[in-house]
Design a protein with these regions (language model features):
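Catalytic beta-strand/loop module used to bind and position nucleotide/cofactor moieties
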Residues: 4, 68-69, 76, 81-85, ...
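Intrinsically disordered, low-complexity boundary segments flanking structured domains
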Residues: 22, 99, 156-160
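Active-site histidine-anchored catalytic micro-motif
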Residues: 27, 44-47, 51, 60-69, ...
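Short, electropositive, low-hydrophobicity segments enriched in small/polar residues
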Residues: 13-15, 99, 142
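Anionic-ligand-binding alpha/beta catalytic cores of soluble enzymes and soluble regulatory domains
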Residues: 118-164
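N-terminal glycine-/serine-/threonine-rich phosphate-binding loop
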Residues: 1-76
């Protein structure tokens, strides 16, 4: 049994969540899909990071977590798959996973390189679904990507209280 979690900023009004689940089930009928949240504020990577960090440890080791928040592959933002704490995380390299790796060194991180093996009009979520299904069938990360040693540095706003 493979568990694949979904955390997105898609909301529930449109067809996007259902289409993503359909894509996963079309490739891997035995997958168990669990929604963590689809109500992340649009492009709010900090909120997504908080949700993933708070939720992932409630799932068994080997769970695959797809994070579809600010997930477009533009500029120097690449898609990544990371094995960390015996879980797998698939998302854009946009800072979402930075809080996790501050606590424990990742077992492996790859920059996903299968985009050219899929249809030219494939969506980012279809790539994430293909990677999740590959991993859920016991596939290795180095088959779907090139190993990288670190994530993109992203500055995070922090709050503080002062007497001013």
């Amino acid at each position: 049994m493979s568990i694949i979690t979904l955390t997105t900023d898609f909301g529930h009004k449109d067809y996007f969540v259902g289409a993503l689940k359909g894509k996963i089930l079309s490739e891997h009928k035995e997958a168990v899909i669990v929604d963590i949240s689809h109500e992340i504020d649009l492009f709010n990577t900090l909120e997504a990071s908080y949700c993933i960090e708070a939720a992932y440890h409630n799932f068994p080791k080997g769970t695959i977590h797809i994070i579809g928040v600010d997930s477009e592959r533009v500029g120097d933002t690449q898609h990544i798959a990371m094995q960390w704490d015996d879980h797998y995380f698939i998302c854009a390299d946009n800072g979402i996973l930075n809080t996790l790796i501050q606590k424990k060194i990742p077992q492996k991180i790859v920059a996903i390189t299968i985009h050219d093996r899929l249809n030219t009009d494939v969506s980012d979520m279809a790539v994430f679904a293909a990677v999740a299904c590959h991993i859920s069938r016991g596939g290795l990360l180095n088959v779907i990507g090139k190993e990288i040693k670190s994530l993109k540095e992203v500055s995070v706003l922090t709050s503080s209280i002062s007497d001013d």
